[in-house]
């Protein structure tokens, strides 16, 4: 028996964590889509953005450059783990693609594989659109589950460093008085 649990085994974010993460990823997606991410900063995301066609969206809330670069470092880890998951995340958050549009993309790149039919026989075939929709949903949830602790810790570390830096300045200015 495998020791790795699937999403259905309880490895999901709670509502509060999910809202926090999706808020930051949405701001990050708007930041990436705006073109503020330079190629020299993150070639992985910039390379992907160069391959897709941009669409006009109403003004979306965007994170600042410091937050964007911090999130980029965390999201780039997903690229090295699973490129398909990375692409699906960018489609969801940078291009604000619907679940169906993401599933259509995933269906287009899906390779035939051995699948169990309703009569419990194995057959080598391409997954259906419904299967792709379910898989996309699970892949995005899994990627978000992987990103959350790293992103939360990155923000926490950055905030504590910022507070320490400001406290050091306050100590120095109080000594001068």
Language-model segments: residues:
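Residue-level signal for the short linker/turn that defines the boundary of a DNA-recognition helix
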Residues: 97-98, 127
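Residues within the helices of the helix-turn-helix
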Residues: 100-105, 110
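Key DNA-contact positions within bacterial/archaeal DNA-binding proteins
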Residues: 130, 134
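Short helix-to-turn junction characteristic of helix-turn-helix DNA-binding domains
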Residues: 92-96
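A short pre-motif secondary-structure segment
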Residues: 88-89
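N-terminal interaction/assembly modules
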Residues: 1-80, 108-113, 120-124, 128, ...
